[in-house]
Protein backbone atom coordinates (compact mmCIF):
# COMPACT_ATOMS: atom_id res chain seq x y z
CA UNK A 1 0.00 0.00 0.00
CA UNK A 2 2.83 2.44 0.86
CA UNK A 3 4.63 1.84 -2.44
CA UNK A 4 1.48 2.57 -4.45
CA UNK A 5 0.85 5.77 -2.47
CA UNK A 6 4.43 6.94 -3.05
CA UNK A 7 4.14 6.29 -6.80
CA UNK A 8 0.89 8.24 -6.96
CA UNK A 9 2.42 11.19 -5.08
CA UNK A 10 5.52 11.19 -7.34
CA UNK A 11 3.36 11.38 -10.45
CA UNK A 12 1.35 14.21 -8.91
CA UNK A 13 4.48 16.18 -8.09
CA UNK A 14 5.87 15.74 -11.61
CA UNK A 15 2.65 17.01 -13.14
CA UNK A 16 2.60 20.03 -10.83
CA UNK A 17 6.17 20.92 -11.77
CA UNK A 18 5.32 20.76 -15.48
CA UNK A 19 2.33 23.02 -14.98
CA UNK A 20 4.46 25.59 -13.16
CA UNK A 21 7.09 25.59 -15.96
CA UNK A 22 4.42 26.23 -18.57
CA UNK A 23 3.03 29.10 -16.52
CA UNK A 24 6.48 30.67 -16.15
CA UNK A 25 7.08 30.42 -19.90
CA UNK A 26 3.68 31.98 -20.62
CA UNK A 27 4.39 34.83 -18.15
CA UNK A 28 7.73 35.51 -19.88
CA UNK A 29 6.06 35.52 -23.31
CA UNK A 30 3.34 37.86 -22.08
CA UNK A 31 5.88 40.24 -20.56
CA UNK A 32 8.01 40.27 -23.74
CA UNK A 33 4.99 40.73 -26.07
CA UNK A 34 3.46 43.29 -23.64
CA UNK A 35 0.04 41.54 -23.56
CA UNK A 36 -2.81 43.16 -21.67
CA UNK A 37 -3.52 42.37 -18.01
CA UNK A 38 -6.85 40.68 -18.80
CA UNK A 39 -5.17 37.96 -20.87
CA UNK A 40 -2.74 37.29 -17.96
CA UNK A 41 -5.63 36.86 -15.58
CA UNK A 42 -7.30 34.30 -17.83
CA UNK A 43 -4.05 32.34 -18.06
CA UNK A 44 -3.74 32.25 -14.24
CA UNK A 45 -7.28 30.95 -13.90
CA UNK A 46 -6.57 28.21 -16.43
CA UNK A 47 -3.40 27.24 -14.53
CA UNK A 48 -5.28 26.98 -11.21
CA UNK A 49 -8.01 24.83 -12.73
CA UNK A 50 -5.43 22.53 -14.31
CA UNK A 51 -3.60 22.14 -10.97
CA UNK A 52 -6.89 21.31 -9.20
CA UNK A 53 -7.68 18.72 -11.83
CA UNK A 54 -4.29 17.08 -11.35
CA UNK A 55 -4.78 16.94 -7.57
CA UNK A 56 -8.21 15.30 -7.98
CA UNK A 57 -6.73 12.74 -10.35
CA UNK A 58 -3.96 11.90 -7.84
CA UNK A 59 -6.48 11.43 -5.01
CA UNK A 60 -8.68 9.20 -7.18
CA UNK A 61 -5.70 7.05 -8.16
CA UNK A 62 -4.61 6.73 -4.49
CA UNK A 63 -8.12 5.71 -3.35
CA UNK A 64 -8.34 3.14 -6.16
CA UNK A 65 -4.96 1.68 -5.17
CA UNK A 66 -6.05 1.52 -1.48
CA UNK A 67 -9.26 -0.30 -2.42
CA UNK A 68 -7.30 -2.81 -4.49
CA UNK A 69 -4.85 -3.49 -1.65
CA UNK A 70 -7.69 -3.85 0.92
CA UNK A 71 -9.50 -6.31 -1.38
CA UNK A 72 -6.28 -8.34 -1.73
CA UNK A 73 -5.83 -8.40 2.09
CA UNK A 74 -9.45 -9.51 2.63
CA UNK A 75 -9.04 -12.29 0.07
CA UNK A 76 -5.92 -13.56 1.86
CA UNK A 77 -7.75 -13.90 5.29
CA UNK A 78 -8.76 -17.50 6.16
CA UNK A 79 -12.36 -18.57 6.85
CA UNK A 80 -11.43 -19.65 10.41
CA UNK A 81 -10.21 -16.15 11.29
CA UNK A 82 -13.37 -14.63 9.84
CA UNK A 83 -15.55 -17.00 11.89
CA UNK A 84 -13.67 -16.12 15.10
CA UNK A 85 -14.08 -12.41 14.41
CA UNK A 86 -17.80 -12.87 13.79
CA UNK A 87 -18.18 -14.83 17.06
CA UNK A 88 -16.39 -12.13 19.08
CA UNK A 89 -18.54 -9.42 17.53
CA UNK A 90 -21.79 -11.30 18.28
CA UNK A 91 -20.94 -12.03 21.98
CA UNK A 92 -22.18 -9.40 24.46
CA UNK A 93 -19.59 -7.84 26.74
CA UNK A 94 -19.48 -8.38 30.51
CA UNK A 95 -20.41 -4.78 31.16
CA UNK A 96 -23.54 -5.08 29.02
CA UNK A 97 -24.59 -8.28 30.82
CA UNK A 98 -24.04 -6.62 34.24
CA UNK A 99 -26.11 -3.63 33.15
CA UNK A 100 -28.92 -5.89 31.98
CA UNK A 101 -28.87 -7.75 35.34
CA UNK A 102 -29.06 -4.45 37.24
CA UNK A 103 -31.95 -3.27 35.10
CA UNK A 104 -33.77 -6.56 35.77
CA UNK A 105 -33.26 -6.16 39.53
CA UNK A 106 -34.61 -2.60 39.40
CA UNK A 107 -37.56 -3.71 37.30
CA UNK A 108 -38.41 -6.36 39.91
CA UNK A 109 -39.14 -3.69 42.48
CA UNK A 110 -41.37 -1.77 40.07
CA UNK A 111 -43.30 -4.65 38.54
CA UNK A 112 -45.33 -6.69 41.05
CA UNK A 113 -46.53 -9.18 38.45
CA UNK A 114 -43.04 -10.61 37.92
CA UNK A 115 -42.69 -11.02 41.69
CA UNK A 116 -45.59 -13.48 41.73
CA UNK A 117 -44.04 -15.80 39.14
CA UNK A 118 -43.40 -19.35 40.39
CA UNK A 119 -39.82 -20.17 41.25
CA UNK A 120 -38.79 -16.53 41.59
CA UNK A 121 -37.46 -15.17 44.86
CA UNK A 122 -38.00 -11.66 46.15
CA UNK A 123 -34.75 -9.80 45.54
CA UNK A 124 -35.68 -6.60 47.35
CA UNK A 125 -33.54 -5.39 50.21
CA UNK A 126 -35.36 -5.85 53.53
CA UNK A 127 -32.54 -4.63 55.78
CA UNK A 128 -33.62 -3.17 59.11
CA UNK A 129 -33.04 0.48 59.94
CA UNK A 130 -31.78 -0.55 63.39
CA UNK A 131 -31.38 -3.73 65.43
CA UNK A 132 -34.53 -2.89 67.42
CA UNK A 133 -36.67 -2.38 64.31
CA UNK A 134 -38.98 -5.20 63.19
CA UNK A 135 -37.97 -7.33 60.22
CA UNK A 136 -39.81 -6.69 56.97
CA UNK A 137 -40.89 -9.68 54.86
CA UNK A 138 -42.69 -9.64 51.54
CA UNK A 139 -46.29 -10.89 51.58
CA UNK A 140 -46.13 -11.64 47.85
CA UNK A 141 -44.89 -15.19 48.12
CA UNK A 142 -44.68 -17.18 44.89
CA UNK A 143 -47.08 -20.12 44.68
CA UNK A 144 -45.92 -23.21 42.80
CA UNK A 145 -47.74 -24.04 39.57
CA UNK A 146 -47.61 -27.76 40.30
CA UNK A 147 -50.80 -29.24 41.68
CA UNK A 148 -51.61 -32.76 42.88
CA UNK A 149 -54.47 -33.93 40.68
CA UNK A 150 -54.45 -37.51 41.98
CA UNK A 151 -52.89 -37.89 45.46
CA UNK A 152 -50.32 -40.68 45.48
CA UNK A 153 -49.31 -42.43 48.69
CA UNK A 154 -45.68 -42.09 49.61
CA UNK A 155 -43.80 -45.37 49.52
CA UNK A 156 -42.60 -46.29 53.00
CA UNK A 157 -39.69 -48.67 53.52
CA UNK A 158 -40.43 -50.97 56.45
CA UNK A 159 -38.86 -53.96 58.14
CA UNK A 160 -40.96 -57.13 57.57
CA UNK A 161 -40.01 -58.44 61.03
CA UNK A 162 -41.79 -55.51 62.70
CA UNK A 163 -44.63 -55.13 60.20
CA UNK A 164 -48.05 -54.35 61.77
CA UNK A 165 -49.70 -56.96 59.52
CA UNK A 166 -48.00 -59.68 61.58
CA UNK A 167 -49.71 -58.42 64.73
CA UNK A 168 -48.38 -56.60 67.82
CA UNK A 169 -44.65 -56.72 68.54
CA UNK A 170 -43.74 -59.10 71.34
CA UNK A 171 -40.72 -57.53 73.02
CA UNK A 172 -40.17 -60.60 75.23
CA UNK A 173 -39.56 -62.80 72.19
CA UNK A 174 -37.29 -60.18 70.57
CA UNK A 175 -35.21 -59.95 73.75
CA UNK A 176 -34.79 -63.72 73.82
CA UNK A 177 -33.74 -63.80 70.14
CA UNK A 178 -31.27 -60.89 70.49
CA UNK A 179 -30.07 -61.73 73.99
CA UNK A 180 -26.48 -62.19 72.76
CA UNK A 181 -26.22 -58.40 72.16
CA UNK A 182 -26.29 -57.81 75.93
CA UNK A 183 -23.11 -59.89 76.32
CA UNK A 184 -21.46 -57.98 73.46
CA UNK A 185 -22.25 -54.66 75.15
CA UNK A 186 -20.80 -55.91 78.44
CA UNK A 187 -17.55 -56.85 76.68
CA UNK A 188 -17.40 -53.44 74.98
CA UNK A 189 -17.80 -51.65 78.32
CA UNK A 190 -14.94 -53.69 79.82
CA UNK A 191 -12.66 -52.94 76.86
CA UNK A 192 -13.48 -49.24 77.05
CA UNK A 193 -12.56 -49.09 80.73
CA UNK A 194 -9.19 -50.72 79.99
CA UNK A 195 -8.44 -48.33 77.11
CA UNK A 196 -9.33 -45.31 79.29
CA UNK A 197 -6.74 -46.42 81.85
CA UNK A 198 -4.05 -46.90 79.17
CA UNK A 199 -4.59 -43.69 77.15
CA UNK A 200 -2.49 -40.63 78.05
CA UNK A 201 -4.04 -38.11 75.66
CA UNK A 202 -6.58 -36.07 77.64
CA UNK A 203 -8.85 -35.26 74.68
CA UNK A 204 -9.04 -38.90 73.64
CA UNK A 205 -9.68 -39.93 77.24
CA UNK A 206 -12.60 -37.48 77.54
CA UNK A 207 -14.11 -38.83 74.33
CA UNK A 208 -13.84 -42.43 75.56
CA UNK A 209 -15.38 -41.46 78.90
CA UNK A 210 -18.38 -39.94 77.14
CA UNK A 211 -18.82 -43.13 75.11
CA UNK A 212 -18.62 -45.23 78.28
CA UNK A 213 -21.20 -43.03 80.04
CA UNK A 214 -23.66 -43.31 77.14
CA UNK A 215 -23.26 -47.10 77.04
CA UNK A 216 -23.80 -47.43 80.79
CA UNK A 217 -26.90 -45.19 80.70
CA UNK A 218 -28.29 -47.29 77.86
CA UNK A 219 -27.65 -50.42 79.88
CA UNK A 220 -29.53 -48.94 82.87
CA UNK A 221 -32.54 -47.91 80.76
CA UNK A 222 -32.70 -51.38 79.18
CA UNK A 223 -32.61 -52.95 82.66
CA UNK A 224 -35.47 -50.68 83.84
CA UNK A 225 -37.58 -51.56 80.80
CA UNK A 226 -36.91 -55.24 81.32
CA UNK A 227 -37.94 -55.03 84.98
CA UNK A 228 -41.14 -53.15 84.12
CA UNK A 229 -41.96 -55.78 81.50
CA UNK A 230 -41.37 -58.58 83.99
CA UNK A 231 -43.74 -56.96 86.52
CA UNK A 232 -46.40 -56.55 83.82
CA UNK A 233 -46.04 -60.17 82.70
CA UNK A 234 -46.32 -61.34 86.30
CA UNK A 235 -49.52 -59.30 86.80
CA UNK A 236 -51.03 -60.66 83.57
CA UNK A 237 -50.36 -64.25 84.61
CA UNK A 238 -52.04 -63.63 87.96
CA UNK A 239 -55.04 -62.04 86.25
CA UNK A 240 -55.39 -64.94 83.82
CA UNK A 241 -55.59 -67.39 86.72
CA UNK A 242 -58.22 -65.20 88.42
CA UNK A 243 -60.24 -65.02 85.18
CA UNK A 244 -60.26 -68.82 85.06
CA UNK A 245 -61.76 -68.79 88.54
CA UNK A 246 -64.53 -66.48 87.24
CA UNK A 247 -63.32 -63.06 88.39
CA UNK A 248 -63.22 -59.90 86.20
CA UNK A 249 -59.74 -58.92 84.95
CA UNK A 250 -57.99 -55.82 86.34
CA UNK A 251 -55.77 -53.87 83.94
CA UNK A 252 -52.92 -51.88 85.41
CA UNK A 253 -52.65 -48.19 84.49
CA UNK A 254 -49.30 -46.66 83.57
CA UNK A 255 -49.08 -44.75 86.85
CA UNK A 256 -49.73 -47.99 88.78
CA UNK A 257 -47.09 -49.77 86.72
CA UNK A 258 -44.52 -47.10 87.65
CA UNK A 259 -45.39 -47.41 91.34
CA UNK A 260 -44.92 -51.14 91.28
CA UNK A 261 -41.57 -50.80 89.50
CA UNK A 262 -40.39 -48.30 92.13
CA UNK A 263 -41.51 -50.57 94.98
CA UNK A 264 -39.76 -53.52 93.38
CA UNK A 265 -36.49 -51.63 92.83
CA UNK A 266 -36.32 -49.65 96.10
CA UNK A 267 -38.33 -51.92 98.40
CA UNK A 268 -35.28 -53.99 99.33
CA UNK A 269 -33.14 -50.90 100.13
CA UNK A 270 -32.70 -49.84 103.77
CA UNK A 271 -30.97 -47.09 105.75
CA UNK A 272 -28.64 -44.69 103.95
CA UNK A 273 -29.13 -46.23 100.51
CA UNK A 274 -32.86 -45.54 100.67
CA UNK A 275 -32.26 -41.95 101.87
CA UNK A 276 -29.88 -41.28 98.98
CA UNK A 277 -32.35 -42.61 96.44
CA UNK A 278 -35.20 -40.54 97.91
CA UNK A 279 -33.06 -37.37 97.88
CA UNK A 280 -32.04 -37.96 94.27
CA UNK A 281 -35.66 -38.50 93.26
CA UNK A 282 -36.75 -35.33 95.09
CA UNK A 283 -34.14 -33.19 93.30
CA UNK A 284 -35.16 -34.64 89.95
CA UNK A 285 -38.83 -33.82 90.52
CA UNK A 286 -37.97 -30.28 91.72
CA UNK A 287 -35.91 -29.65 88.58
CA UNK A 288 -38.78 -30.71 86.34
CA UNK A 289 -41.22 -28.48 88.24
CA UNK A 290 -38.88 -25.46 87.94
CA UNK A 291 -38.61 -25.94 84.18
CA UNK A 292 -42.39 -25.92 83.81
CA UNK A 293 -42.76 -22.79 85.99
CA UNK A 294 -42.86 -19.28 84.41
CA UNK A 295 -39.67 -17.21 84.72
CA UNK A 296 -41.10 -14.73 87.26
CA UNK A 297 -41.94 -17.51 89.74
CA UNK A 298 -38.72 -19.50 89.41
CA UNK A 299 -36.81 -17.37 91.91
CA UNK A 300 -37.82 -18.36 95.44
CA UNK A 301 -37.98 -15.40 97.85
From Swiss-Prot:
Keywords: Coiled coil, Nucleus, Ribonucleoprotein, Ribosome biogenesis, rRNA processing. Residues 1-169, 199-232, 282-301 are annotated as: Disordered. InterPro entries: RRP36. It is found in: Nucleus, Nucleolus. Residues 43-70 have a biased composition (Acidic residues). Residues 113-128, 145-164, 199-220, 286-301 have a biased composition (Basic and acidic residues). Residues 182-272 form a coiled coil. It comes from the Eukaryota. Pfam families: RRP36 (PF06102). GO terms for cellular component: 90S preribosome; nucleolus. One of its GO terms (biological process) is maturation of SSU-rRNA from tricistronic rRNA transcript (SSU-rRNA, 5.8S rRNA, LSU-rRNA). Associates with 90S and pre-40S pre-ribosomal particles. Component of the 90S pre-ribosome involved in the maturation of rRNAs. Required for early cleavages of the pre-RNAs in the 40S ribosomal subunit maturation pathway. Belongs to the RRP36 family. This is rRNA biogenesis protein rrp36. It comes from Sclerotinia sclerotiorum (strain ATCC 18683 / 1980 / Ss-1) (White mold).
Amino acid sequence: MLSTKRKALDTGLQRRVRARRESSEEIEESSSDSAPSEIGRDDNEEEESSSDETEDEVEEEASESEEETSNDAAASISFGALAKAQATMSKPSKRDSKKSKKSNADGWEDNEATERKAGKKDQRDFTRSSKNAPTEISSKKAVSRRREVVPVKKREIRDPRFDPTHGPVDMGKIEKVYDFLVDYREDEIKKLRKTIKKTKDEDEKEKLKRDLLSMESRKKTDAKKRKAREILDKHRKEEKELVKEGKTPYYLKKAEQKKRVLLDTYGELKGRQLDRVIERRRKKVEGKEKKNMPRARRVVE
